[in-house]
């Protein structure tokens, strides 16, 4: 089975039913619009939207869960997708924080991928360590055998943060820049540096260096482009 990763664009529509994006619509109207937006988007990839598990960017429980066909909603921050998942698709919500995708193989060659969203709170609460530990548990692979992909996100001169949120020195040491009484975070460096501490091979860490605040493919609150994209992961027999 081939691991496929694909990302919605602004042209595909806002991947959310939140009122803040559609203030004039009723709850029923927002839900209907969201359902139809998902169906249209996934139909382009020949994926049944009923087989899609949404990973909300509000999830804060730093635990992992293996996705199965019976799962409809999740509260965990990390979802695990196996190559035997029979067409299930995990779609992670993305606005200003990167989606993190990590993969590892078992001794018999089967693949497992972890999907999570690198919000400040989740990273501060050792999300990356839990991703590594979850893949070790599922595959018995060593951290240096794992591969990480980090999606587009704001550049280091765009992501303004409150220093009070960065309480975990293991994650945030030497990752901020002060300019005109404002603090900006180099979130890519924070992720890279933390993964190195977790004994991940630096040659196996891949970043999409696109600045999501300026690139027109992506929604971004920081870039005054309110909305959400979906970063989607699925195992299929063919490349999508």
Q: In which residue ranges do the predicted regions lie?
A:
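Glycine- and Gly-Pro-enriched alpha-helical subdomains that act as flexible
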Residues: 99-182
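Intrinsically disordered, low-complexity, positively charged segments
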Residues: 7-45
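Short, well-ordered amphipathic alpha-helical segments that serve as non-catalytic structural scaffolds
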Residues: 31-41, 125-139, 190-194
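Phosphate-centric recognition/catalysis
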Residues: 42-120, 209-218
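Short helix-terminating capping/connector loops at secondary-structure junctions
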Residues: 46-48, 139-145, 200-202
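Extreme N-terminal starter segment of soluble prokaryotic enzymes
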Residues: 1-5
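C-terminal accessory segment of soluble enzyme catalytic cores
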Residues: 160-240
